[in-house]
Amino acid sequence: MEHLSNLEQPTTMDSYDFQKLTNDENLQGTESQVPSGSKSASTNGLLSAASSAAGSSFGLTPSAILQQKHENAQQGKKQNNSKSFSKKPAIDVHSEDAFPTLLSKTGPSKPRIVSWVRKTASNTSVAGSDSVSRDKIPFSASSRASSTKSTLSSVKETDFVTETLILSPDNQAPRMSFVGKPNSVAEIVRTVMHQTSTRINVSTASKTKNTTFLIQGKTSAVKAARRQILKLIGRRETKTMPCPVFVVGAIIGTNGQNLKSIMDRTSTRIQIPKRNNTANESSDDAKKPEKEENSAASTLDDLEPQYEMTTITIEGDFEGVELAQKDIEAIINERTSNTTVRISHISTELYSLLRGPDGKNIKELEEGRDLKVQIPFAYLDPSAPVNPIVLSGEKSAVRECALYLQGQAEELLRTTIPTMLPIPRRQHRFINGEKGVGIQDILRKSGCSVILPPINGDSDVVSVRGPALNISEGIRLTLERANSTIVDAVNITTAYASSKNPFDIASIVARLFLRSRKLIPLEEECAVQYHLPKREELQSNSNKTVIIEISGKSQEAVREGRAKLLALVNQFPESKFYKVTIDPLLQRYVIGSKGKNLQKLRNEHQVELLVGEYGEEDPDVIVCYIGADDGKSPDQIQKELADLAESVKSSAEASAKIVSEIIQVPSVYHKHIVGPKGTTLNAIIGKSEENVIVQLGKVSYRPDSTDDDVYIRGFSKDVERVVSEIKQVVRDAKNHEILHSHVEEFDFPAQYSKNVIGKNGSNVSSLREDLGVQINVEEGHIRIQGIKKNVEETAARIKSQIEALIDDTILRVNIPNDFHRQLIGSNGKYVRRLEEKFSVRVRFPREDDSSNSTGNELMKPTSPDEVVIRGGKKSVAAAKQELLELYEYEKSIAYTSTIDIPSKAVSRVVGRNGSTVENIRTQFDVKIDIGDVSTEETTPVSVRGAKADVENAIKEISAIAEEVKNLVEKVIKIDREYHRYLIGPNGSKLQNTIKECGGSTDKTETARLISFSNGNSEEERNSVVLRGDKEIVEALETRLLEIVEELKNQVEEKIEVPQRCISSIIGRMGSTRRDIERKTSTMLNIPNVLDPEETVTITIVGSPENCEKAKEMIQEKVASQYTQMITVPDTVYESIMKGILMKKLRSDLKVFVDTPEIKPVQPTEVVLEDHEDGVFPWKLVTHDYTGSSSSEWAVRGHKENVEKAIASLEKSIKQVMENCIAYLGIPTNLHRRIIGSGGSIINKIRKIAQVKIDVPRTPGDEIVVVQGSRAGVVKAKDLIFERLQENQNQE
C-alpha cells in the first residue's frame, strides 16, 4: 500500500491536520478480543480488534503497515521533487508484502483483487491484472503537507469501495486524543462505523504526523462516513462572504429548503442576518427584485451593477465550509449574470439615426443575442430631461452594444449636420404621419432624421439632421410632407359670443362632437378631416377659445368642410344644452349596464348625455338635445331638457341612497387603516370599491376638514359597514403586535397544492403583495399570518379558489377526426369562442401526442377521435352540448367533390413547399387531398367542405391545371456575349423586358420563365430556354431578338472629364451612373484614376443617338462642378453663416459653398453717438470688421449661378460691414405704443426705414434694439421718438 497515500485526488477543499495516532498500550487492549493463534485480523481494522496472531503471521499489525507505507510515500515524494528522472520500478499490486491481506476469522481466503483508480482518471486498471505500472499511478507533483487526498477502490465481488482520507496535523481539531476519552478519535470513529455501517482503519505516520483513514463500505455509506469524520475530527473554521440582499431569498429557498439542503450536505452552520423579513421570503419572491437590482448600472464606464450587500457567515469543518461557500457562490452568480445600462450622454438628436428606419438597427443589434435595446423617440426640447438609451441583457452583450452605440454616435456627429426649419405647428402632424410613419419614410428615403418639438410646447422649429449630401433631400421631403395638406382653423367660440360664457358652450359642443361622432359624415362627404381639441384643452382655465382645425388635399374641399362645420355648429344654440349635477357615485346608474340607459334616452328623447367627461370626480352631466327643433322655442326646449334632467337625477337617486359620514381618528392610526401598500383599506372596501369613497386627513375641497378626519361617502349600507370595520381596525391597531399575530390555518385536498401556489409561486406572491400577509403552503395544509382582516380576506380567496378546483370536471367526447378541423375553425377561432363563452378548456388530438410525454396528461386525448373538455360541471356540460350540435351541423353540410388534373400540373397545384394548395385551403376553408402521382396522365384531387366553397376551390385548381396545359418550351440561339446585356445589373433589364411582354416580375416566376444555359458545348452556352405561357414566350422571344439586334448595332463613344468631377458622375453608391445608364439605355465604363490633376476617359456603349444623350448628361454634371474662390474677412464669418443667405444659395441657385474651419473673430464695437440725457436715452454703435485675417471660400455649381452667388455674398458682406445698431431706452409700459394694434405701427416703421426692430418681451427689460444701415437706424429712431412724443401730447 505504499502508493496509496500518494494518489492524486481532485479536491476543492483546503488541507486538513490531525494529531499523530500512536500505537500505545490503549490499542493493545483491543487485541484480547481476537482468539489466540488466529492468523487474521478483522477487516473492521484497528478499532474492531487488530489481532496479535495476525501480527505474528505478517510481522506487523495493519496500523503499523499503514504507518510504514506513509513513511515510504513521503520518501517517494522527496524523490519526485528531485531533479533525477530515473525510471521507477513497477509495483506489483498482488504482492502480499506490499498489500497484506486481512484474513477473516474463519480462515485464510484468496487474495482480493482490487483496482486502484483516481476519481478523475479515464483509464482504470482491470481487476485481475498481474501488475500495474508505476507510471499509470501518478504521484503528487509536490509534497503539500496540508493537502487532502483520497483514493477509491471498487471491489467487483461485493460492490464495496475503499476510500483513503489523509489529514495533516494542521487540519485536525486541536487536543484530540486517540483513545480513552468520550470525544477521542477512537470513540468518534467507532460511532461513525456504527452509524454508517462501514469499516475504518486509522494510522498515523511517525515523520509527517499525517493521519490516514481507510474507509470501506458501500459508496453512499463511505461518503457519509468521510463527511462525518471531517465534521467531528476536522479543523473547525468560520468564514464570511458578501452576498447581494436580493439573492438571499434564493439561497434560503421555499420554507428554507435550499439553505437546509446546503447545511445538511456540507455539515455546516450558515447564518444570514435578518433584514425586513428576508428569511421568510421564498426563492420565487427573491426573483422579483433581481431585475430591479440589475438596473443599477447607469453609465458606460461602470457596467457592473452596485448591489445592496449583506454578510453570510459559514461555520463548520474546513472542507464543508468551502463546499458551502461554492454552493452559495453558484447561486449568486446565476442571479447576477444580467445587467441593465442607461446611456444618457448621447445626444437625443442622434436617436432616430441610431434606431434606423422602423427600428432596423435595433433589430440587427438584438438578433442572436441575449439583449434588449430601447432607444426612445426624441423631441426638440432642450429644457426637457434626457430620456436615456436603455440596454438590458447579458453583461458582455450589453457592454459590446454600449461601445458600439457610442462609436456610432461619435461617427454621426462628425458626418451629419443639423438644419432647423420653421414650420407652423399645425403642419407638424403631417410630417409625423400616423404613428410616425412619415418620419420613418423620410429617414428611409434620405437617411435624414426629423425631430419635432413637443406636442404641448409652443415652438415651431423642426430639426432635420443627416449627411451633407443628403440633407437637401431630407429638407425637401420634410417640406413636401408639411405642405401636402391644406389646413384651416375655425374658432367656434365666436358662434356663442352672445352667451355669458362662450367658451363653456363651445367646449360642450366640441365634447358632443367627440362623443357623438357627428363630424364623420361631413369628413366623408367633403373629403376632409376635422381635428378637435383634446379634453385637457377644453378643461383648461387658461384657454378661452375652442378651435377646430380642418385639413384636406384641396382648397375647395377645405372651404366646403368649413362651411359644413359652421352650419352644423349653428344647429346647436345654447338653448339645446342643460347642465345638471349628479353625484359621481350615481352616474353609473345614469349610464346603465353597457350604456343601455344612454341609448334609451337617445332613442326616446333625442338627447345625448355627456357624463364624467373630466374624470371620475366630475359631478356635472350635460344634457344635449340633438333632435330637430320642430318649431319649439328656445325656452320650451330648455324646459323640456330641465324636466328630463331632473327625471334622470331622481331615477339615479332612487337606485341608491348616497350618504356621507366623518369619523375622528387620530392621524397616527391612519397608516393602520391604509395598511401596507393600501392592503388593509382594500380589504375593508372589498367588492364595494365602486360604491364607497374613503378619504383620510385634510383635503382641499373640504375647507373644514382636519388631519384627523376619515371621510366616507357612498351607499348607506356600504358606508355603515365600512365605518364599523374602520373603527374595528383602529381598535385593533392600539396593540400592533397582537394585530399582526393573527393566524388562520386550514386543510384542503393535497392534490390542489400546486394550484394554490401557482406557477413559480405567482398566486401566493400576488396575495402577499395585495393583502400583506405571510402564507406557508404545505401538502394539504395552509397557514396564513398577518392582520386579522387581511388574513380573513386571504383565506376567503384561497377557499374560493379551492372550491372552484373541486368543481373542476373533465369530459371526453368522441367525434370523428375528419370533423375536427371544422370544429376548431381557422386559426382556432371556433374553439376559442367556445372556451371564452363557457370558461372551459377544450383539447383536440394532436399529431405529436403519442411522442410528446410532457404537458398535462389529464387533458391529453386517448384516441384520434377524442375531444377533452375541462372546467366547471355545468360549464363543461353546456360546452359539450354546443360542441355536439356544431358537429351535427358540420356533418349535415359536409360535401366532397373529386376532379382529375394532368399529373404534370400537380406540382403547380401544390406550389413551393405546399404554399399554393395551402392558400386555396385557407381561402375557401376546404380540405384538399391529392392522390399519388403515378405513371398515369391524370391524378385525382378530392376537395371537401361546404358546397359553394368546394366548387370555388375546384375552379381555382382547374384554372391552375389549365394554365399548365398552355405551357410551351422554346430554345432560341443568342450568342453568350450578349447574355449579360440582356440580364442587366441585378437582373433589372431582364425584369423590365419580361414586364413589357406581359410576364410576372416575381423572381420565382422569372427563373421558371427564362434560363440562360451554362452547358459544356458552345451550342449549349449560346442557348436561351423559354418556358411558360405560349403568348408570353412568343412575345419574349421576339423582344429578346430585337434587343440582340440593337446590341449588334451599338457603338463606343469616349468623353474626357476632369477627375474631380468623377464623384458627381458616379453619385452615391453609383446612383447617378445608374440613372444615366437607365435614361439613355447605355453602359458607362469609368476607369479608376486617383490623380486629381489628370483627366478621365469615359467609354459610352450604346446606339449613336443614346450615346449623344449620355454625353450631354455627363457634360451637364461636369458643368455643375464649376468652382470659384472668394476672399471673406474672418470678422464677418459668423454673421454670414447665421443668416439665411447660405440656405437661399443652396435652394435657389443650387450652389454649394465650402468654408474652412476657422475660429470666428469678433469685430470691435465703435460708439458713434451716445445720448444718456433726455427723456429717452439712446446710443448708436457700429462694428469695425476690418481685420488682418481672412479666408478663402469655394463656391461650386453652374458657372452663371456661381457668379450670381459670389455677387450676393459680396453684397451681404458689404451690408454686414455697414450695419449699425441703436439701443433705445424706452420704459416697458410704453412699448405697446410703438408696437400698435397687431404690430401695425412697428411694422410700418420697419418698412419705411428698412431696418430690423426688436422689442423685448421680458418684464423689466427696457432696451429696444434697432439694426440696419446708419441712415435707416437714425430714421427709425426718429419715428419711434415722434410716436412716443405724440402719445404724450395727447395724454
Swiss-Prot record:
Pfam name, any one: KH_Vigilin
Disulfide bonds, paired cysteine numbers: none
Annotated Low complexity bias: 73-88
InterPro entries referenced in this protein's UniProt entry, alphabetically: KH_dom, KH_dom_type_1, KH_dom_type_1_sf
Modified residues (Phosphothreonine): 935
GO BP, sorted A to Z: intracellular mRNA localization; regulation of mRNA stability
Main location: endoplasmic reticulum
Comp. bias regions, Polar residues: 1-39, 268-281
GO molecular function list: mRNA binding
Basic and acidic residues composition-biased segments: 284-294
Compartments it resides in: Endoplasmic reticulum; Cytoplasm
Record keywords: Cytoplasm, Endoplasmic reticulum, Phosphoprotein, Repeat, RNA-binding, Stress response
A GO term from the CC aspect: cytoplasm
Residue list for modification Phosphoserine: 115, 934
Span list, region Disordered: 1-45, 70-91, 124-148, 266-303, 845-865
Residue span, KH domain: 166-229, 236-328, 339-405, 416-486, 575-644, 658-726, 741-798, 808-883, 894-957, 967-1040, 1050-1114, 1219-1280
Domain of life of the native organism: Eukaryota
Function description: Required for cell survival under thermal stress.
Official protein name in the record: Vigilin 1
Protein's organism: Schizosaccharomyces pombe (strain 972 / ATCC 24843) (Fission yeast)
